[in-house]
């Protein structure tokens, strides 16, 4: 047990899917897993363990932003011995290379947060995912006929950004979208010798102002859930 997770040791499988929204975690458990069991609920941040096609897998919410995400990731790795962490979330596109419903694999994560500079003695940290997880995601997407978009993301501390003038510059540097956690997830996994990857479904386009309806968000997210579960099975 940790200050933020009240699961017992052994409740988590070595592979864990992460979502910012705990209700989305519950949705995945009920719709996609067999024998799903709630294993933690501190602060209503839900976690489940169950099976997908006979293989054990866990789910955990992590809240919004790098600070919240890294708390849960640290405790999952250090206390519960989780080895592979796959974040599946939504993002806002900033590049003409991607559109609504596209799934992005974050091959690098820039950030306006100072957390990685603090942990890396004020140097620039290259926040990147695990290669083997990335390869599995790419190969699984090919098998499922999913056109996975690969590029960088920008992990912002601000949901309501005041640096919209920087979107064109980010796109020039092959940043496909903005989200809020990948840079912290990758850095924490690197520090603690775990494997991590972030997949994001485009729910909004910050340049064209297009946005999915609530129904479309669920449908597009389901495709990413299936990709995530298939690559972990």
From Swiss-Prot:
Uppermost EC category: transferase
Annotated catalytic residues: 204 (proton donor)
Similarity field: Belongs to the PNP/UDP phosphorylase family.
EC number annotated for this UniProt entry: 2.4.2.1
SUPFAM superfamilies, alphabetized: Purine and uridine phosphorylases (SSF53167)
Protein's recorded name: Purine nucleoside phosphorylase DeoD-type
GO cellular component: cytosol
Gene Ontology MF terms in the entry: purine-nucleoside phosphorylase activity
Chain positions recorded as a purine D-ribonucleoside binding sites: 4, 179-181, 203-204
Subunit and partners: Homohexamer; trimer of homodimers.
Residues annotated for phosphate binding in this entry: 20, 24, 43, 87-90
């Amino acid at each position: 047990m940790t200050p933020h997770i009240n699961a017992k040791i052994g409740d988590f499988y070595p592979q864990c899917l992460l979502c910012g929204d705990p209700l989305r975690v519950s949705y995945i458990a009920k719709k996609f897993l067999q024998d799903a069991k709630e294993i933690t609920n501190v602060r209503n941040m839900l976690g489940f363990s169950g099976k997908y096609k006979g293989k054990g897998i866990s789910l955990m919410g992590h809240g919004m932003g790098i600070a919240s995400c890294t708390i849960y990731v640290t405790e999952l790795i250090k206390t519960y011995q989780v080895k592979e962490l796959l974040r599946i979330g939504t993002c806002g596109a900033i590049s003409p290379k991607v559109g609504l419903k596209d799934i992005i694999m974050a091959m690098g994560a820039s950030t306006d947060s100072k957390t990685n500079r603090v942990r890396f003695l004020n140097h620039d940290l290259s926040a990147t995912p695990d290669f083997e997880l990335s390869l599995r995601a790419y190969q699984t997407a090919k098998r499922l006929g999913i056109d996975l978009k690969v590029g960088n993301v920008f992990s912002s501390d601000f949901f309501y950004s005041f640096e919209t003038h920087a979107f064109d510059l980010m796109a020039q540097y092959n940043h496909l979208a903005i989200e809020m956690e990948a840079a912290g997830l990758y850095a924490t996994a690197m520090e603690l010798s775990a494997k991590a990857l972030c997949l994001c479904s485009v729910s909004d386009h910050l340049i064209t102002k297009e946005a999915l309806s609530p129904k479309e968000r669920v449908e597009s997210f389901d495709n990413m859930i299936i990709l995530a579960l298939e690559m972990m099975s």
